[in-house]
Amino acid sequence: MSFPAPKPKAPELPQKLQHKLECNQGAVRAVRFNVDGNYCMTCGSDKTLKLWNPHKGTLLKTYSGHGYEVLDTAGSYDNSQMCSCSSDKTVILWDVAQGQVVRKFRGHAGKVNCVQFNEEATVIMSGSIDSSIRCWDCRSRRPEAIQILDEAKDGISSIKISDHEILAGSVDGNLRRYDLRKGEMCADYLGSPITCVSFSQDSQCLLASSLDSTLRLLDKDTGELLGEYTGHQNHSYKLDSCLSEKDTHVLSCSEDGTVCFWDLVEGSLVLKLPVGKAAVQSLSFHPSECCLLTASEGGVQLWRGASYEEEGGS
């Protein structure tokens, strides 16, 4: 007689509050882990960008150079540079250690919602309310964009890059994927303004959140709808969503002050994490650990799994 095999342990969710950062930079428009998850950046409505060690709760540096609120940021693969974008229509390339502006890129006709580096950090891509994605060469001194992608009929809300592919979400309701090697573009119409887009960790699936309070998971190659996730509130604001570090769960900010977690396969809402009273605008999942950053009410919160011990890890 054999015993039934034990059920695999359900993956932990980051629901234990570990640290709170009082950012002192107005409303925090975005929080982003760096590439290895040791640091994070916060974008403020007070025009500043800040670099933190969120695991210790310490501020490392403040970056000033934008003329209006900072809306998004990303770090380079080697942590030596950051890029950021702003309502002032500019994109800035920063030297992280020096705290200095390396380049300021101008060309967008309206506020710039999102920025990403390519994997080598030689090109910055930015998406704007002016309906365009612009590609900026970090190494060249030329001021104009090296490429402009202008297929969208309304503002670009979110972009992500994976290898040679760009994923872009637009207020026109289309999820567009650009294959830079083949020079091809595919579009999937989702029917509602898109607020955030993500690749899964294995780059086989696409996640898009929309202002109809629905997240959709699509097969990257076929565009087939694999799952829909509801139960959060997203009618008014540009809110972040993402997949957990092992692609087991879908996460989204919510306008009711929570972050929602769904089982990716089942589609069931498994946790509503209470973060604050106001809308949770931004989140960032650690690249390799059960660890989540959220931004709400001018501060940032760091969450860990329930079994995590401060000394020695989980």
Swiss-Prot record:
Q: Per its UniProt record, what PROSITE patterns does this chain match?
A: WD_REPEATS_1, WD_REPEATS_2, WD_REPEATS_REGION
Q: Name one GO cellular component term.
A: cytoplasm
Query: Would you say which domain of life the source belongs to?
Result: Eukaryota
Q: Where are the WD repeats?
A: 23-62, 65-104, 107-146, 151-188, 189-228, 231-272, 275-313
Look up keyword rRNA processing and say if it applies: no
Q: Which UniProt keywords apply?
A: Cytoplasm, Repeat, WD repeat
Described function: Molecular scaffold protein for various multimeric protein complexes. Acts as a module in the assembly of a multicomponent scaffold for the ERK pathway, linking ERK responses to specific agonists. Also involved in response to hypoxia by acting as a negative regulator of HIF1A/HIF-1-alpha.
Family membership: Belongs to the WD repeat MORG1 family.
What is this protein's record name? WD repeat domain-containing protein 83
